Amino acid sequence: MLTTDSDPIVAIATAPGRGGIGVVRISFGRAGEAAAQPLMQALTGQTLAARRASYVPFLDASGDALDRGIALYFPAPHSYTGEHVLELQGHGGPVVLQLVLQRCIDAGRAFGLRLAEPGEFTRRAFLNDKLDLAQAEAVADLIEASTEAAARSAGRSLDGAFSRDIHALVEDVITLRMLVEATLDFPEEEIDFLEAADARGKLARIRERLGHVLSEARQGALLREGLSVVLAGQPNVGKSSLLNALAGAELAIVTPIAGTTRDKVAQTIQIEGIPLHVIDTAGLRDTEDEVEKIGIARTWNEIERADVVLHLLDARTGMTVEDEAIAGRFPAGVPVVRVLNKTDLTGLAPATRALDADLDLSEVRLSAKQGDGVALLREELLRIAGWQAGAESVYLARERHLIALRAAEEHLATAAAHADQNSQALDLFAEELRLAQDQLNSITGEFSSDDLLGVIFSRFCIGK
């Protein structure tokens, strides 16, 4: 069946499973009030007042009540989607919700009512200018938030904080483009428009503001995605003990027998609101045990995908030949923290130090068993992540936002280089400003392909 963005659509808007309340939502698309009024009459036996809660029966085709609950009618454009919307809020049992949903589809078949696709209600809100693209993505991020900090940041994006900063940057770039275009269009004038309007100073200020927005977006991306942290090292160096210490719970089995962990144990923990996906892995060593070999192979697969590797060492022996061989296989470009564990058996005090800034290699001494120095490791992980403690204005951001912001930053840097050249480079200056503007507009959806929209909204749940 060929679907369009103007079809009437319906879906269950609440999460699957049993609950006190279940919501069925209809957005009437191009059919509008011509479909809304007769469908309300068929489903509730009443004509509903706009934006007023009515306690009504939800009727089947014979006029018998399937359920009773609250019906809300939102005429366009004052609704979530910007279209005429009807919500039936009844009991949250899966059977009764499916009955009400099917009744809606049957009653609305004459108007082309169909089941909504994932994210289609929010897509309509975007297409009808109720939300821009960054705000629409924030709806999904708010639903999926795994920490309080992520939820609050998603809320800021939904309220438009991120979008307002992007729109302000776009307006500044447009103003600067106008100055450049004026200079190009009137070359015979003696006035230097760029010099008179302090164009270079304006560009510098735009780049400074963009840098601030990018910094906030990076923080938001951390809150959304978190970090993948892999515990690696020889058997019996305390990897499982460290996982338990970081999590504050007995998640992994700890014994003095080397090779106890044969497969990965994964746990997501929070540090200052950042989700850390910590993975305890099988000890790395030469072995003839076929099961253990499989676990070791999986360990290396996890290391290849890690954002950070915690290389655990026994503080009593330090870096051994075997540890050197393990470290030599770590992927380039991945930050590594050498964790000297079991300091309680050596008399060493917990401490942190940088080993190689260029390689992002550092060292933390701690005792996972006693908990001494674990706080230092948490601080080191925050440093590696680039987290700025106490950030209050963070908005949740996605990888595509960061890519667009970095691209805009590069175009503005190139524009600045052209601005310092002679007037023959002005057309290149103007072009780089245009490209920067396009990148910024792609964040809010001012310039977005249908393919991009399809990918974004397909990841929403049905009913949103």
UniProtKB/Swiss-Prot annotation:
Q: Which CDD domains match?
A: trmE, TrmE_N
Question: Where is the protein localized?
Answer: Cytoplasm
Keyword Transmembrane present in the record's keywords: the answer is no
Per UniProt, which keywords does this protein have? Answer: Cytoplasm, GTP-binding, Hydrolase, Magnesium, Metal-binding, Nucleotide-binding, Potassium, tRNA processing
> What are the binding positions for K(+) in this chain?
236, 255, 257, 260
Tell me yes or no: is Disulfide bond among this UniProt entry's keywords.
no
Q: What is its EC number?
A: 3.6.-.-
Cofactors (names):
K(+)
Q: Which domain of life is it from?
A: Bacteria
List residues binding Mg(2+). Answer: 240, 261
Residue positions annotated to bind (6S)-5-formyl-5,6,7,8-tetrahydrofolate are 25, 87, 130, 464
Q: What is its main location?
A: cytoplasm
Give any Gene Ontology cellular component. Answer: cytosol
Q: Which GO terms describe its biological process?
A: tRNA methylation; tRNA wobble uridine modification
**NCBIfam families named among the record's database cross-references:** mnmE_trmE_thdF, PRK05291.1-3, small_GTP
Q: What job does this protein perform? A: Exhibits a very high intrinsic GTPase hydrolysis rate. Involved in the addition of a carboxymethylaminomethyl (cmnm) group at the wobble position (U34) of certain tRNAs, forming tRNA-cmnm(5)s(2)U34.
Sequence similarity: Belongs to the TRAFAC class TrmE-Era-EngA-EngB-Septin-like GTPase superfamily. TrmE GTPase family.
Assembly state and interactors? Homodimer. Heterotetramer of two MnmE and two MnmG subunits.
Q: What is this protein called?
A: tRNA modification GTPase MnmE
Query: What is the native source organism of this protein?
Result: Paraburkholderia xenovorans (strain LB400)
